[in-house]
């Protein structure tokens, strides 16, 4: 809380369950969260509801419903800390009930905000004493860049269609960028040789990404540009990032925080 308040973020509390449509439309129909991991139920009013699997969609819904975009000074800076639920195979570091801390900035397209959010994550991890902090960043570009890159990916992956897992086969036409997030070992060599989105950004997207990097340099944040990062949710554009750190008992670098812009 102290770090967020230093950056003038205010706490927001959202419901533990929301209308299922919020996550289907907001998080993305092709995301693993929606297709495999949500806890869905029908309430007594015959409404389809979902236990929240992540925090962003509920915050954005609250921003719109409460008209925070109206007379309030922009951007609106919020942070949350709450329980999330995902139906996935329990394993080390992954539980079906988890606590997620996050920050959201709404009402600004300034690349400085991207760097600020990354800086908050790094400062929180430093404050709690984590070592070996590593920041990986990438740009997914604007819609024009992603549409062009989508065509390139379909052309690249099509010859390998019979070698890919079933999930990737389904993603090829719907959202080929999601193929790059595949965790199946047999697909890894195909992914490594795939075209990189950073080579297909248009001038505006490339310039924006360069500005984010300059802001990170000014904030003295060490980072690596990693074109393989696409994140697992469908709403991201432009900057995406992952923050790794050493965690006692795990013995290796672990991704503890991640996020990105969603214009």
Identify the residue ranges that each predicted region occupies.
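TRNA-recognition modules of translation machinery and tRNA-sensing kinases, especially anticodon-binding
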Residues: 1-263
């Amino acid at each position: 809380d102290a770090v967020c308040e230093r950056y003038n973020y205010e706490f927001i509390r959202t419901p533990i369950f929301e209308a299922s449509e919020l996550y289907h439309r907001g998080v993305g129909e092709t995301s693993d969260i929606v297709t495999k991991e949500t806890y869905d139920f029908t309430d007594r009013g015959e409404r389809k509801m979902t236990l929240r699997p992540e925090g962003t969609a509920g915050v954005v819904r609250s921003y719109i419903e409460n008209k925070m975009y109206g007379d309030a000074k922009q951007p609106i800076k919020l942070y949350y800390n709450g329980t999330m639920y995902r139906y996935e195979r329990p394993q080390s570091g992954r539980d079906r009930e988890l606590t997620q801390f996050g920050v959201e900035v709404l009402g600004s397209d300034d690349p400085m905000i991207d760097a600020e959010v990354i800086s908050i994550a790094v400062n929180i991890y430093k404050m709690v004493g984590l070592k070996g902090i590593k920041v990986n960043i990438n740009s997914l570009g604007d819609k024009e860049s992603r549409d062009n890159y989508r065509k390139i990916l379909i052309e690249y992956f099509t010859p390998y269609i019979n070698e890919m897992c079933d999930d990737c086969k389904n993603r090829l036409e719907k959202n080929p960028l999601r193929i790059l997030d595949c965790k199946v070992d047999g697909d890894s060599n195909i992914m490594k040789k795939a075209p990189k989105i950073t080579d297909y950004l248009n001038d505006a997207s490339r310039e924006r990404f360069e500005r984010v990097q300059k802001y990170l340099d000014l904030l003295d944040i060490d980072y690596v540009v990693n074109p393989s990062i696409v994140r697992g949710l469908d709403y991201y554009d432009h900057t995406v990032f992952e923050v790794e750190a050493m965690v006692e008992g795990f013995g290796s670098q672990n991704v503890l925080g991640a996020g990105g812009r969603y214009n």
